[in-house]
Amino acid sequence: MGSTDQAVTSVRRSAQLFTDACAVIPGGVNSPVRAFTAVGGTPRFITEAHGCWLTDADGNRYADLVCSWGPMILGHAHPAVVEAVSRAATNGLSFGAPTPTETELAAEMIGRVAPVERLRLVNSGTEATMSAVRLARGFTGRSKIIKFSGCYHGHVDALLADAGSGVATLGLPSSPGVTGAAAADTIVLPYNDLEAVRQTFAQHGEQIAAVITEASPGNMGVVPPGRGYNAALRAVTAEHGALLIVDEVMTGFRVSRSGWYGIDPVDADLFTFGKVMSGGLPAAAFGGRAEVMERLAPLGPVYQAGTLSGNPVAMAAGLATLRAADDGVYAALDANADRLARLLAGALTDAGVAHQIPRAGNMLSVFFSETPVTDFAAARNSQSWRFAPFFHALLDAGVYPPCSAFEAWFVSAALDDTAFERIADALPTAARAAANATPESRP
């Protein structure tokens, strides 16, 4: 099966849809990375997806290496999830009242992550981190939060400073509209630098409510924590009476049955979850020690609420996803990530392109760099201008990678031999495009 067999022949319909969208939606998209700003070209408007395959409005099919930015570990339109969603929708879409399924999902999640004793369901990862930070401040009576450069915790004003994900993709230091007052109690430190954390606690320890960190960052590209880093954060926060918030929105229930906690079991005070836990529908959660969580209303004074929180259709999708994700699914995820990493490394090595392919379980990234990437500064110093030609060569061959050098690559358990043949066929051309790129290749 040659790469020309899968060449994308036309994107005319996607281009028209993007023009139409730009007339009614700012930038034509509802999340900035989707606009292809970092790579240029026409965003693909997807009309359907099954297994590991996406189909766009022009009928082009792509092997999916984004998986809706992480959630689709089973692949798209998995029968068990579709059946659960259909059954739930038949019984009503939203009630504004408690439902049995939200309790079932909460219990399923609590059973997988030992430090989580209570869980509150919300509608997005942003809501989860925002609420966790508010709760940490309410519980400790302190105001300051430490976050790390390159870690992204949703578009919460106080946490956008020097963030990853779309903020990194667009090259923004923060965002207009975030006031000095909103960010005044946020301390931003370099990632993987424990000495900076210790020094900051020595200076401000009595004012620090919490440290928030991605369990294993994936929003500046995949940049795993150094050995013992999260455990050291646990130790220093405990020493100073601050809370540790571990953001598992991306890693939770993806990199293992218990998320990053299953790989690096650090007993944080609070965790945030999203993506996989709702099976591709809008839902998220935060949870942790009962003593902390029971400060939430209606038991305590820290307020948090949401009209659609615990939505029965989203709960059904999440519960079906977690129950279908057995040991075989996680073995397939790991094997597929291994296979993809080998193909990437082989093609880039053959083309003479310096590269790093860091891993966080079955998540990975491609950095065009001679040296390992251990923090946001190193990620930004990589030769990211090589990424756009690399990306477009893959996309034109019917492979759908992340559209930014600063995003993670995700596999599903449904990624099959046909998809891998397509990826293997496309990579040599893509690697040569990266090799021939210059700084002027930026879109």
Curated annotation (Swiss-Prot):
Localisation: Cytoplasm
Matches recorded under InterPro entries: 4pyrrol_synth_GluAld_NH2Trfase, Aminotrans_3, Aminotrans_3_PPA_site, PyrdxlP-dep_Trfase, PyrdxlP-dep_Trfase_major, PyrdxlP-dep_Trfase_small
EC number assigned by the record: 5.4.3.8
Cofactor names: pyridoxal 5'-phosphate
A single GO BP: protoporphyrinogen IX biosynthetic process
Isomerase keyword on record: yes
Pathway named in the protein's UniProt entry: Porphyrin-containing compound metabolism; protoporphyrin-IX biosynthesis; 5-aminolevulinate from L-glutamyl-tRNA(Glu): step 2/2
Pfam families: Aminotran_3
First-listed, main subcellular location of the protein, grouped into a coarse class: cytoplasm
Gene Ontology CC terms: cytoplasm
GO function terms (MF aspect): glutamate-1-semialdehyde 2,1-aminomutase activity; pyridoxal phosphate binding; transaminase activity
Modified residues (N6-(pyridoxal phosphate)lysine): K275
The entry's keywords: Cytoplasm, Isomerase, Porphyrin biosynthesis, Pyridoxal phosphate
Family: Belongs to the class-III pyridoxal-phosphate-dependent aminotransferase family. HemL subfamily.
Name recorded for this polypeptide: Glutamate-1-semialdehyde 2,1-aminomutase
Native species: Mycobacterium marinum (strain ATCC BAA-535 / M)
Organism taxonomic ancestry: Bacteria, Bacillati, Actinomycetota, Actinomycetes, Mycobacteriales
Gene name as annotated: hemL
